[in-house]
Amino acid sequence: MSLIHPLIDVKEFVENNSCKSRFITPISGDQGSSTTAFCSVSMPHDLPHRHLHTSCDEISILIRGEGVYGLGDQRISARVGDCRVVPKGAEHFFVNESGEPSLMVGFFVGAEDVAATGIAYGDLVTKDDLATLRSEQDGGILINLGDVQPENMDQGDGWLITDFRLPISTRNGCSSTLFRARFMPGAVHKKHRHENCDEIYYIISGRGLAGAGSDRVEVRGGHFHFIHKGVEHWLHNLSDTEPIEVVGLYCGAGSVADTGYVYMGDVTPDDLKARTG
């Protein structure tokens, strides 16, 4: 049986042994989303083009690798766990200076594909760019997950997530919310819906069962899942030993309250037995 709510697997793309940097947009207008999710793998020391987006902000998280961000004339050190907002119109780039391929997941907010971002390319980044003195970021948003405190969510509203953090939201001036969730074995985010916004999430690692409407599907590291606003959904960790790590975006909602969160009830034993895709 096919799934109603898009689940896109990028595991092979992420783990490909190719020696080339690569970029993919697994969620876009093709799946009915008004926000585009991207996945970017950069090889060590590859020099990209500077670029900007005239029509949208870019939100991203660096999941693997380290190096340097460019933002206008600034050069900022980049490390795992960095969550970043690049304002529309700001020229930017990332160079991976680690010894392994980096992984960045991000979102072009309110743009249904790359063309709709108003992308414009500049010159190639040079070695002189990388030699520029590193500084603190001035403009946009940059915060590391390690500097963000876990939220104290109400378990009575279905939040049985072990560690839930909101690195980007209206608290630091963003009209969308970037979240990172860790589900230890047995943890669950019970049935709920968002009346006011779509949700896109990416499974960094782990294995679980996801519900979306009538869909019941096993998810694992490398899956993107798109949830339309108003659709009941949930996530349960199926592993006895490993956590699930998830990062996602509440598109166009600057807080959990702004999503129009509605608790819908328990995930039942029958739910956990079912598979529809």
Feature-to-residue mapping (PLM):
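Short acidic-glycine-tyrosine-enriched beta hairpin
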Residues: 73-88, 214-230
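Asparagine-centered strand-capping/turn motif at beta-strand->loop junctions
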Residues: 95-97, 236-239
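Structural motif
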Residues: 66-68, 75, 91, 101, ...
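Short, conserved beta-strand element in jelly-roll/cupin
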Residues: 40-43, 52-69, 107-109, 181-184, ...
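Conserved short histidine dyad/triad with adjacent acidic residue
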Residues: 20-25, 38-53, 160-164, 179-194
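A short, N-terminal "cap"/entry segment at the start of jelly-roll beta-barrel domains
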Residues: 1-34, 116-176, 260-277
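A short hydrophobic beta-strand segment most commonly corresponding to one strand
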Residues: 85, 100-118, 226, 241-259
